[in-house]
């Protein structure tokens, strides 16, 4: 069965938690393991934070967009912004690279996303924004309920 949802929300850091919980709630219908659920929540958090901090420079009057598609046991998540874009995607995906070195704990977002997801594609153009496409195949083992 295929199911999908879309969200759009203001580019404020408080909405990162909302995005994480919304996607996690949506994917629970596939009965992911706790590890899978945690990984999905983490990648959503990282990608949304990248959009807010790097794409929009913490300016709150913009939108972050999420699309989530469930097909059988596969999850497809797209997180998109219309911000400043990424000049060099390969460089941005290098561990510890950040365009904001003054921020604590910067530079691991794409590395974390790539480690938790099966595939990650980043499409970006300067001054046009960035889209991060991610997929993950869930394990076939399901939760046992008492």
Curated annotation (Swiss-Prot):
Pfam families: HATPase_c_2 (PF13581). GO terms for biological process: asexual sporulation; negative regulation of sporulation resulting in formation of a cellular spore; sporulation resulting in formation of a cellular spore. Its EC number is 2.7.11.1. Keywords: ATP-binding, Kinase, Nucleotide-binding, Serine/threonine-protein kinase, Sporulation, Transferase. SMART domains: HATPase_c. Binds to sigma F and blocks its ability to form an RNA polymerase holoenzyme (E-sigma F). Phosphorylates SpoIIAA on a serine residue. This phosphorylation may enable SpoIIAA to act as an anti-anti-sigma factor that counteracts SpoIIAB and thus releases sigma F from inhibition. PANTHER family: ANTI-SIGMA-F FACTOR RSBW, ANTI-SIGMA-F FACTOR RSBW-RELATED. NCBIfam families: spIIAB. Belongs to the anti-sigma-factor family. This is Anti-sigma F factor. The gene is spoIIAB.
């Amino acid at each position: 069965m295929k199911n999908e949802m879309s969200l759009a929300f203001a580019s404020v850091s408080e909405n990162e938690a909302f995005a994480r919980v919304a996607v996690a709630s949506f994917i629970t219908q596939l009965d992911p393991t706790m590890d899978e659920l945690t990984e999905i929540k983490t990648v959503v958090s990282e990608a949304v934070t990248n959009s807010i901090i790097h794409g929009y420079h913490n300016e709150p009057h913009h939108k972050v967009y999420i699309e989530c598609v469930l097909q059988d046991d596969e999850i497809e998540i797209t997180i998109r912004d219309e911000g400043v874009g990424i000049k060099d995607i390969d460089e941005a995906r290098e561990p510890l690279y950040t365009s904001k070195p003054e921020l604590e704990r910067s530079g691991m977002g794409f590395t974390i996303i790539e480690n938790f997801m099966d595939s990650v594609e980043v499409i970006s153009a300067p001054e046009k924004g960035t889209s991060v496409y991610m997929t993950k195949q869930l394990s076939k083992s399901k939760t046992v309920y008492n």
